[in-house]
């Protein structure tokens, strides 16, 4: 069966327990339709880049599944009909990564990020050679 990853965004006014219950509900939908849920994660309340249905924040949930396409379509259909779910994203993947998702890893544990250091190509802002001191330029013009 194909492997999928799903991200659900639920309304911000739900409690954490209700949001986690929503993830469990859709996990059972996948299971009832012949699929297997390989893992679930609750990412918490996050601020979104733009408003969705007048909400600036949302509860994020993540599911890793091994399910037939009919089960995924049924889960997406029910999620879109559910009043508490604002968005659903489903991606077909070649394989699932072991361990927690990138969202759940601590910042220090992310191996692909390098330390920025002092950014040697840019130094501190030194004197501006194209301008002299302010008193040499005369008074600033009046604003109207």
From Swiss-Prot:
Keyword Chloroplast: no
Annotated segments matching region Disordered: 92-144
Protein's gene: rpsF
InterPro entries membership: Ribosomal_bS6 (IPR000529), Ribosomal_bS6_sf (IPR035980), Ribosomal_S6_plastid/chlpt (IPR020814), Transl_elong_EF1B/ribsomal_bS6 (IPR014717)
Family stated for the protein in its record: Belongs to the bacterial ribosomal protein bS6 family.
Protein name: Small ribosomal subunit protein bS6
Organism this protein belongs to: Rhodobacter capsulatus (strain ATCC BAA-309 / NBRC 16581 / SB1003)
Any one GO molecular-function label of the UniProt entry: small ribosomal subunit rRNA binding
Transmembrane regions: none
Keywords: Ribonucleoprotein, Ribosomal protein, RNA-binding, rRNA-binding
Functional description taken from the UniProt entry: Binds together with bS18 to 16S ribosomal RNA.
Biased segments, Basic and acidic residues type: 93-144
Superkingdom in the source lineage: Bacteria
CC annotations in GO: cytosolic small ribosomal subunit
């Amino acid at each position: 069966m194909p492997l999928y990853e799903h991200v659900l965004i639920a309304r911000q006014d739900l409690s954490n327990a209700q949001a986690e219950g929503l993830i469990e509900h859709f996990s059972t939908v996948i299971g009832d339709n012949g699929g297997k849920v390989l893992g679930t994660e609750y990412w918490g309340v996050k601020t979104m880049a733009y408003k969705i249905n007048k909400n600036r924040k949302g509860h994020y949930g993540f599911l890793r599944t091994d399910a037939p396409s009919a089960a995924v379509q049924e889960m997406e259909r029910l999620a879109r009909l559910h009043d508490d779910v604002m968005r659903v994203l489903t991606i077909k993947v070649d394989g699932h990564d072991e361990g927690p998702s990138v969202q759940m890893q601590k910042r220090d544990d992310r191996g692909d990020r390098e330390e920025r250091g002092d950014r040697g190509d840019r130094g501190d802002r030194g004197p501006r050679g194209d301008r002299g001191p302010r008193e040499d330029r005369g008074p600033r013009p009046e604003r109207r």
